[in-house]
Amino acid sequence: MNFELISEYQPTGDQPEAIAQLTEGVLEGVPAQTLLGVTGSGKTFTIANVIKNINKPTLILSHNKTLAAQLYGEFKSFFPNNAVEYYVSYYDYYQPEAYLPSSDTYIEKDLAINEEIDKLRLAATSALLSGRKDVVVVSSVSCIYGMGNPSDFYNNVIEIKKGKLLDRNVFLRRLVDSLYVRNDIELNRGNFRVKGDTVDIYLAYSDNLLRVMFWDDEIDAIEEIDPISGIRLATFDEYKIYPANLFMTTKESQLRAIHQIEDDLTKEVAKFEEEGKMYEAKRLYERVTYDMEMIRELGHCSGIENYSRYFDGRNAGTRPYCLLDFFPDDFLIVIDESH
């Protein structure tokens, strides 16, 4: 799908020339260009026209959440029929874990996640991995912060099709593998419920429910439902259900990671013991062993991001995956400089 720019205005003044020059520069492979203009001169509208002409997935970087939200609103109005997404930090509050050796005090990590922003982040990654070109993601420095492996995220996408033979219980297990949680009493975002042959999924990246109805071992209908009124909004012949969390892994990766972590734990504990640091060795062993038990039983643990390179299969010292890895090789970056 191509970008469809909708506006009551037409480029005027210096805008047509700027649009033409920027478009030509991108098409000719110019690595960097600068658009100058005073406040209120229509730079955002000019860039929107360039995006329409180039027709590639675009990352727009702003220096804080507030201005990113403003740009998101503006581009959303210019491209209402395209995928305009918002990706910033989803923490309302964050206190990292800490240890004070002098008093043997351990301070646990404490945080509060904004569920609405979490939904928008998942919508952004889902749009990028959908294969469509008409995607604009407005982001902040969060786009270079660590996140899950895009391959693992994509491998956990569930594709369903009306008339397809699929055992309902197999479908439910796949939802759990994609980190959706069954809750037949209170349906919240990222949950699903089962009533007979009907499965309602509150998609983690949407405001609506997806209803999948089975007839024996066959998918009979796929519908989008308003979660409050229960009104059917749309029907589909096929649908892709994206995971409920950005940090995905496979069972194979999980088992491999646990073995590697335990091997490294043995080496580090032995190293501490050789140095006479028996307390540190004991503390490290207890913490990591407990984390591995939690991962085996629940699939996650507090501070699991500390083990990310093992789950991603990365070598020591290599950077983690970030939002940039979810973009295709050929995409456009626009940086909005601060005043």
Task: Name each region found by the language model.
Residues 1-339:
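ASCE RecA-like P-loop NTPase motor cores
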